[in-house]
Amino acid sequence: MPERTHPSPIPALLSWTGIALCVVGLVAHRMWQELPFPRAFEHGLLALLALAAAWPLQRWRQWSRAAALGAAWLLALAVFSGPMPVLATALLAAAAIGVGSLVLRGPIALPIGLAMIAGTLGWLLSLPIHHRAVYALACIAVVAWRRRAILDALRGAWHTFDAGVRASPAAATGALLLLGLASTAAWLPTMQSDDVAYHLGLPSQLQATARYAMDARLQVWALAPWNGDVLQGVAQVLAGGEARGAMNALWLIVAAGAMHGLAGALGGDATRRWWAVALMASLPLTMHLAAGMQTELVAMAWLPALAWLVLRDDGTSSPRSVLAGALLFGALCGLKPMHGVVALPMLAWAAWRHRAHLPWRALPVGALLAAICGG
């Protein structure tokens, strides 16, 4: 009889060693003296309020606690960020799923579609066509045209979420609680210096003049990469006002979904997938990014989506996967060249992993799409 093989304990040992070293560092450097206890109290109070708001849905609608928490956080977002920004962002997200599903179907269509929209509109910024009616009609037309693909993607996302919650309800609840706490930064008005001095310029110009003045004499950063600000501009024009909070909440959702999928592609069970989401949401930098318009929040969504694409086919590849990866890589370059540099090892990893099934004929088209999205 063949000998039974046991998984190596080294990966788990490395993971738990990192946690142990973190605890040792906290004690050795007396980090509790630097902890912002008033902020921790505020977060604890918000968590209790969210659980209380979710309780009626659990009690009378028999929703899972994680799903009820998600609904409570979304309702709070609509209250504090405004219903119009949330509706505008939802319309943009639906249109992104519609166009992204032309490349790959399923929830992955959302980050791909956002990359396609940003890459396309980036070439049209100087034209006076960025009116609210134009954006609304374009999004509604895409939603009407691709409604079946959009509904399929939403069903797939819900089934994945529901299955994950049923498999590990406690971990799912913890992850949704932390993700919701991170999203509270999206309730705040835009007030970080970089955002007020630069990032708000593009969305505000699109809303006020229907075009973007790419003139470095007016703003020294006017010709800097702008993919993230373009999507902020679409949401702001559709909403008729600032929509940063709702758009950042969308990026948090995309990042959480990508991290959940990536952890699964790496072999994690349901609990570890939710742990990956919780880890991402609990990083202090995540909340800081959700309060502003920095490119790192967008990269936090697109990079794990690209990594998931590399892993998804278990050693095989397809032309559509190559095109999807090219779109995401180009979008990262158009976000900030640094993010493209960070993604380069993933491209090398993808080439090695899929070397036996690499669709060479799709590579020139992929390179062209990456140049369009990142140019």
Language-model features and meaning:
Residues 163, 342-371:
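Perimembrane helix-loop-helix junctions
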Residues 288-298:
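Short acidic/glycine- and proline-prone juxtamembrane loop motifs at membrane-interface regions
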Residues 65, 69, 106-112, 242-243, ...:
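Transmembrane-helix signature of polytopic, membrane-embedded enzymes
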Residues 1-162:
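Membrane-embedded, hydrophobic transmembrane alpha-helices
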